[in-house]
Amino acid sequence: QVAEVLSSFDTGISGLCKEEVGMDELDKIVPPEIRFTITELLRANAPKRDSDKFGLTIRNENFFVGIEREGAGEPKATVLRTRHGGSLLAFDFQDESDGTRRLFDFMDILFTQSEDKVFVIDELNRSFHPMLTQHLVELFNQVHANDDCQLVFTTHENDIMSYEYFRRDEIWFVERDEEGLSRLYPLDDFATDGARSDARLNKKYLEGRYGGVPVIDLSRARAALNIREG
């Protein structure tokens, strides 16, 4: 299912596979501090019965590692690899693009079994095409239409500011004042602005009607770069 969702975002991924590696090989895959944490967690969760099971997943932008142990048996480590098209080769996680690797992080919000989690994400659109960002939000809204899960995120992608995905009271702006302090306020503060379509909403935002846009002084930049105007 995860591979299907990833493929639907035009990542080129056709499948996922786990490859078992020796615990000693982890030293070549994860940083020393992560390797130490794994050792400490295995020690802290030593089995008390043969039926005891322990598992953990560790990931960052370069690796996706799973550790499992059953009873008094030796722990087993696996690394996630990806397959593309009909290729027989499996690719390392770190070989994927920044956007694809980041997309893995968002699978949690789509596949979570919880009905009341709040996910907070900074710069949702980072490394994503604008269309991908929009579809991700659309899927979240559909998956969690009947539960209390919430997605709170920041973005510089103004095209996502759409009534198709959000109510007016769900769109908020951040504006920094002259002292460097940021103020957070909702679109609902402009309830009489008449922006009832997405095109109108984006136009007013880019015109600075709602604030939250950078104040760019090109003349200062040109002067600093010795660029003559005209």
Q: What do the predicted segments below correspond to?
A:
Residues 1-103, 109, 204-208, 212, ...:
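Phosphate-coordinating catalytic segments in nucleotide- and nucleic-acid-processing enzymes
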Residues 76-215, 227:
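Switch/communication elements of ASCE P-loop NTPase nucleotide-binding domains
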